[in-house]
Design a protein with these regions (language model features):
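Generic structural signal for small/hydrophobic residues in well-ordered secondary structure
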Residues: 20-23, 64, 118, 149, ...
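Substrate-recognition element of Asp-dependent hydrolases with the DxDx(T/V) motif
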Residues: 85-135
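Asp-based, Mg2+/Mn2+-dependent phosphohydrolase catalytic module
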Residues: 2-14, 124, 131-213
Length: 213
């Protein structure tokens, strides 16, 4: 496999593209959720989950092993006081920012050129919010932009595990050497690369609209 790091992708032989969501299509900022939870009394939010690590409780939620109600109860226990459900949801969703229109336009355009897929480590509460937000702002649901979408909380697996990449490949009869995976987190690449998938690290300050898709 080839790791593609240049600003302009070499797309020769690439026929399928797998996109990450947060930090690639949807702008996110973990700091905003950290600050929101600090106001609620949880002062070490980033010790539990960030772009680069996750604790067992949050991993269970992002792999569908906890219900929304169980997640909210767990947050109340972490904070140590009975916060309102709406407060927790608002703080949890604070990290979700915007979908730049140019990215949505790109995804619509390249569907005629590549088979495109979404592969996201996410959860039920976030999914409800960003799905509604995209429809409100752009008149389209996230699922309509791809041939198929894979959310960690529905398939009960998450990146960087090899199984979730195997699922996407086998589920859609994809050849790894014809497939490109775009993500903003380097830790998500090793297992994909072992399977022969090409990868592109979307570095801070770069945008999918600028990399030659």
């Amino acid at each position: 496999m080839k790791k593609i790091e240049t600003s302009n992708l070499s797309m020769q032989n690439i026929k399928k593209v797998i996109f990450d969501l947060g930090g690639v299509i949807l702008n996110i900022d973990f700091k905003k959720t950290e600050e929101a939870f600090q106001l609620l009394g949880l002062n070490n939010f980033l010790d539990h989950i960030s772009q680069h690590h996750i604790t067992d409780f949050f991993e269970k939620y992002e792999t569908g092993m906890l219900t929304d109600a169980e997640f909210i109860t767990g947050i109340q226990k972490l904070v140590g006081k009975p916060l309102e459900e709406e407060q927790i949801i608002a703080a949890w969703n604070a990290l979700l920012l915007d979908f730049p229109p140019a990215r949505i336009a790109l995804l619509k355009r390249i569907k005629t050129k590549y088979r495109t897929f979404l592969l996201s480590n996410t959860n039920s509460i976030h999914h409800i919010e960003y799905r509604a937000r995209l429809y409100r702002d752009e008149g389209v649901y996230i699922e309509d932009l791809f041939e198929k979408v894979y959310y960690s909380h529905t398939v009960k697996m998450r990146k960087p595990g090899a199984d979730i990449f195997r699922l996407v490949l086998s589920d859609n009869n994809l050849k790894a050497d014809e497939t490109l995976f775009i993500d903003d987190t380097l830790a998500n690449f090793p297992e994909a690369e072992k399977l022969g998938i090409h990868v592109h690290h979307l570095k801070p300050g770069t945008d999918i609209t600028e990399i030659g898709l």
